[in-house]
Amino acid sequence: MRLGLLGGSFNPVHNGHLAIARQAREALGLDQILFIPTKHPPHKPNGSLAPAQDRYEMVRLAIASDPSLAISDVEIRRPGKSYSIDTVRLLQQEYGAQTQLFFLIGLDAFLDFPSWREPRTLLELCRFVVLSRPGLLFRSLSTVPLLPPIPVPSLMDLDAERISRIEAPLGTQGLICLKLPPSAVSASDIRTRIRQGLPMANLLPPSVESYILQHHLYQEDRNRTNS
């Protein structure tokens, strides 16, 4: 089985997240994408973070009709902060050695990868897939520690969309840089719209929008602007 791991705060999960998951699954030939909501993201301030159980439930509702998308509560049920190394080890035990893990991560987050807990070990446990992010260039990877030398012209070709992916040796699993269509949807923008009472304009799955309104999420402090 080829399993994509998509972690995040999903605060809230939105149509952009779903599009990224489906596009990555198709581009990489994955059997399934596993959404992994974080309980306490170690690299983000709590700010306007909704309760973990609410964020989990919103993801569950969002993917309910798509069997190619699944959800794990591995980080929700674990006490303390959510570190990727712990999550990957637990998922390896759960799914077994026959499952190949693909760690999907945005370019913005991957630039901080050397500061993560046990980054070198992570590179031995799963294959990293770095996804394009609006406003960021893949050629910035040329200065990231721990990475193999990737030819800058190839990174520039990826930025210019002359190619759609690059594969490079990294750890025992390898690295994939994948250019996806840009998404204009932002969780922080959605939270702002909710606080201001603005319509969602098809930014959220209907079930998620209903859940937010029913449980009065993201409305407690209309002056808060944390992203």
Across the structure, where does each feature detected by a protein language model lie?
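Nucleotidyltransferase catalytic core that binds NTPs
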Residues: 1-227
